[in-house]
């Protein structure tokens, strides 16, 4: 991993950290991408698909292969929970609504070797218990019961998951089940997982508080939340772990410090201990080494563009949205900006029409481009102005 990110990771715990119970009970196979790396026991764990996001603005602070689709394992249960949260907000269900535990949900969830909440066949379970099972202990049986109860079948529920992903602009996402169990077509990028987590924080506070619960008891069984950040990183309050043989050990984590939220996503580690170590050190680095810089607020004018044959000679260029750039603190100190457009612009121009870009660049920063829109409607010139412009062009080009 890049030196800037792992500077904090070299200060490791002196003694071995006790692993928490994890979902899978099969021996773990090393992720394919890590198989060719030399074994260096003293080195810090090297996760794959790393995203560090500023949770307030959504700016990506650090990206390592963060846009590549990856197998998310149980981290995709964030979307499962979101679909349930949407139904609650729309008053289609309540927390007291009860769903039937079918043989399919029992056999493929409660009787599987993955995480489950010990649901009993043919029992009736409240959505309150089911959603806690999904969020706190990653229960596969609860996922299937919720999918069948809400949509009639897991496949119909998956269609809702994929439709919601499209609505949220999660372009890398494609889901094939409600649980995250292995499937080569069940993928999402770490950057899109971070965006999904940020959406949950902002729009489903009633569910989000469950992600910080340390344990859940159902049917006489108490299970602990596997999130290694809870209780170890100041301000940590979510979200979700994941593990399969194909994905390795991954984490979507979030924490708030000094009023600022950071969201962390990574995958591909070889053990729970590695996930714990990487999660703690990366989240600390997220607050200590990274920052954001606001370039402009939505609607702020950043320049003007020349207009050809318009009712006025220039168009005001304003920010379409808030413009925030994130990255290592040292990099942000050297930012440069400039406006680019293909001009002069040709009238008529609608107010809010994208007509230019603000380019942000600097040493060590990948160039970023943000849309600028016309702050005014600009009509076409009248016939006299057009005729005069025609004469001007004709005679200026005659010599």
Regions found by a protein language model. Name each.
Residues 13-20:
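C-terminal segment of classical bacterial N-terminal signal peptides
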Residues 24-194, 198-203:
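Active-site-adjacent loops and short helices of periplasmic peptidoglycan-processing enzymes
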Residues 13, 40, 62, 89-91, ...:
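Generic marker of residues within folded, mature protein domains
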Residues 23-44, 328, 380, 384-391, ...:
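Compositionally biased, proline/threonine/alanine/serine-rich low-complexity intrinsically disordered stretches
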Residues 6, 42-48, 245-249:
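Short, flexible loop/turn motifs enriched in small residues
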Residues 1-7:
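Bacterial N-terminal signal peptides that target proteins for export
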């Amino acid at each position: 991993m890049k030196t800037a990110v792992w500077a904090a990771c070299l200060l490791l715990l002196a003694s071995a950290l006790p692993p928490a119970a994890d979902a899978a009970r099969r021996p773990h196979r090393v992720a394919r991408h890590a198989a060719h790396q030399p074994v260096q026991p003293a080195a810090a764990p090297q996760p794959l698909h790393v995203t560090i996001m500023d949770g307030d603005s959504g700016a990506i602070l650090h990206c390592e292969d963060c846009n590549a689709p990856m197998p998310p394992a149980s981290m995709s249960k964030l979307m499962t929970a979101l679909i349930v949260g949407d139904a609650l907000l729309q008053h289609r269900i309540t927390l007291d609504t009860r769903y039937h535990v079918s043989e399919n949900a029992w056999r493929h969830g409660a009787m599987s070797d993955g995480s489950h909440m010990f649901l009993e066949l043919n029992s009736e379970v409240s959505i309150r218990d089911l959603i806690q099972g999904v969020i706190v202990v990653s229960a596969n049986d609860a996922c299937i019961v919720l999918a069948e109860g809400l949509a009639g079948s897991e496949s119909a529920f998956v269609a809702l998951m994929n439709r919601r992903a499209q609505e949220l602009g999660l372009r890398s996402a494609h889901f094939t089940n409600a649980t995250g169990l292995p499937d080569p077509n069940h993928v999402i990028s770490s950057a899109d997982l971070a965006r999904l987590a940020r959406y949950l924080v902002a729009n489903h506070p009633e569910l989000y508080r469950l992600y910080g619960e340390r344990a859940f008891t159902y049917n006489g069984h108490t299970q602990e939340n596997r999130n290694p950040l809870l209780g170890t990183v100041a301000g940590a309050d979510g979200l979700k772990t994941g593990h399969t043989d194909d994905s390795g050990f991954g984490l979507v984590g979030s924490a708030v410090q000094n009023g600022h939220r950071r969201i962390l996503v990574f995958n591909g580690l070889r053990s729970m201990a590695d996930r714990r170590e990487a999660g703690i050190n990366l989240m600390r680095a997220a607050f200590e080494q990274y920052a954001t810089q606001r370039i402009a607020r939505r609607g702020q004018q950043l320049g003007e563009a020349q207009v050809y044959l318009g009712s006025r000679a220039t168009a005001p260029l304003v920010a379409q949205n808030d413009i925030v750039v994130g990255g290592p603190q040292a990099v942000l100190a050297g930012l440069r900006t400039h406006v680019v457009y293909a001009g002069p612009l040709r009238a008529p121009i609608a107010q809010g029409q994208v007509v230019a870009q603000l380019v942000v660049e600097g040493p060590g920063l990948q160039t970023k481009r943000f849309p600028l829109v016309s702050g005014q409607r600009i009509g076409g010139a009248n016939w006299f102005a057009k005729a005069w412009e025609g004469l001007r062009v004709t005679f200026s080009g005659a010599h």
